[in-house]
Amino acid sequence: MASPDDPEDYQDRAAPAAHRVRAGTMLLANTDLLEPTFRRSVIYVVEHNDGGTLGVVLNRASETAVYNVLPQWAKLAVKPKTMFIGGPVKRDAALCLGTLRVGSDPVGVPGLRHVQGRIVMVDLDADPDELAPILEGVRIFAGYSGWTIGQLEGEIERDDWIVLSALPTDVLVEPKVDLWARILRRQPMPLSLLATHPIDLSRN
């Protein structure tokens, strides 16, 4: 996990390609990964340690309103204010990510755990009214994506995933944005060319 001591960690900065998985990096499904659960998925890595890797899919919105599940968090939830499908593991469990307001410091704030930059894990048992002054918004995920130790590394060696750095704006982007393509477009050549890969392969 990144150290929160550097105030620059809480600013938006350009996100270059990453060379290793760590908390705060993203896994983009490569074009050959066609399994429906993860095709064109963007996974934000929340934890990566000796026990394995945990992340949430950023671009899989559900039709379930946050208000119907966790009404106390509906006000802080960003549009479209629906639950997102974080992955195939424990769909009955909820996990929340939030983006800090610029200049806010999460250190010592009950209910927040710093991940990277301005992104924090939010304890859903906390009082949202107490956290609202320092959060731009939150997104709540049903379930998560997980890998045992060494499993993700094997998938990366197989070229299933592209490991990239994240910007705070990636985490709360609206579903109408093609997040997978947007992230690739900001990468250097030749990686940015993958952004032109068609969504519907039958039209290629």
Swiss-Prot record:
GO cellular component: cytosol
Disulfide topology: none
PANTHER family linked to this entry: UNCHARACTERIZED PROTEIN YQGE, UPF0301 PROTEIN YQGE
NCBIfam families on file: PRK00228.2-1, PRK00228.2-4
HAMAP family: UPF0301
Family that this chain belongs to: Belongs to the UPF0301 (AlgH) family.
Name of the protein described by the UniProt record: UPF0301 protein Mflv_0850
Organism annotation: Mycolicibacterium gilvum (strain PYR-GCK)
